[in-house]
């Protein structure tokens, strides 16, 4: 009687059960799944910051597995895909959470290519193995963008994007509580399979923008009454061709049927069903970009310098209605890493537990809707903002960590940046010279005080800096502004 050939999905499920059970029970024997021509790569970076390279052969794979120090390794399988590939092989894609040595659980993706072993029917070995942690690929921190002043064109603002922050900020933290299991594979909870996972694509290395909306105080508004209110820098999302990628798979809700229980393999594994994204506010999306001709707009409540012909009254009224009430920066909070399916009412109810929310707005990124949203929360007092900053990290829905920061003006950010450069310049100036550290004042002034110390170089008195880097060739960003 001829044995029926098993389906690729059945082979993949059985392999996943055996592999992760052995990873939990006896990881020192994990190399037996591999052959002489196998390749193995485990996510991470080396000492120089480069991704780990693959190792080849059963012996090298054995040493690599031992170097990873697997101990009490517990795995939660969220989804398994298996398809037939060349030469009667099977490619298996696994997504789940992994906890090693009692550490917090971390999301991972692992791909196996199973090849037939010799002439033995239905026997496979791992020809290729690729493992990556998601938090090493997708970062939840967002790079900060210094918003241009109101006298500059928005196109110039988009050309001066800073470098993104390191994405490996929380490499050892997880969003889930570790649940010990006996065989290393645990059936996930019902609600955990419906969690939204908004993660940006790492392959394109798209620079995220975290706009810090600049708001002037009342004195500055009186001096610049014709200056337009700063518009939210939200560009209309350009919908690219929807190509299939694993980043889009992980960003969708995964069905509970695509899990592996502790007793074996689930009866059926469904591919994730893509769900439509929640549309952002039409008011934000329909907002036109600023141009230089739109700047001279009047604001009610302040004396204008003089009317100018050619202004659109409707556009002026819409802008004034949106930005009549101005709140201090200490009452406002920047909130990043918002899920796509969130609405303003849900977010407002969440922050009402900290204080009275008087205004809230959610903005979307302009990169095809694939990046997390961000927004601003305004309280009627500065005390809730300080409580939230002290209580970080802020977990939303119990699983999504929100990136909360105090709102700062552009002038404050420039003072911090310039102050750092001048401090280093003062340290270098104080370290040189035969008299040792001389403090803030020059050597000539110390000589006048106590009659000792070397004379100033060249017979010229040293100039005292203002601490702001305002002198020629002083300050980190002086050359750039010219």
Swiss-Prot record:
Residues 331-409 form the RRM domain. There is a cross-link at residue 281 (Glycyl lysine isopeptide (Lys-Gly) (interchain with G-Cter in SUMO2)). Changing residue 438 to C: Found in a patient with a neurodevelopmental disorder; uncertain significance; no effect on function in stress granule formation shown by rescue assays in transfected G3BP2-deficient cells. Residues 191-225, 290-300, 408-432 have a biased composition (Basic and acidic residues). The modification Omega-N-methylarginine is found at residues 457, 468. Residues 140-158 have a biased composition (Acidic residues). GO terms for molecular function: molecular condensate scaffold activity; mRNA binding; RNA binding; signaling receptor complex adaptor activity. The modification Phosphoserine is found at residues 141, 149, 225, 466. Keywords: Cytoplasm, Host-virus interaction, Immunity, Innate immunity, Isopeptide bond, Methylation, mRNA transport, Phosphoprotein, RNA-binding, Transport, Ubl conjugation. Forms homooligomers. Forms heterodimers with G3BP1. Interacts with NFKBIA (via N-terminus). Interacts (via NTF2 domain) with USP10; inhibiting stress granule formation. Interacts (via NTF2 domain) with CAPRIN1; promoting stress granule formation. Associates (via RG-rich region) with 40S ribosome subunits. Interacts with PABPC1. Scaffold protein that plays an essential role in cytoplasmic stress granule formation which acts as a platform for antiviral signaling. Plays an essential role in stress granule formation. Stress granules are membraneless compartments that store mRNAs and proteins, such as stalled translation pre-initiation complexes, in response to stress. This is Ras GTPase-activating protein-binding protein 2. It comes from Homo sapiens. The gene is G3BP2.
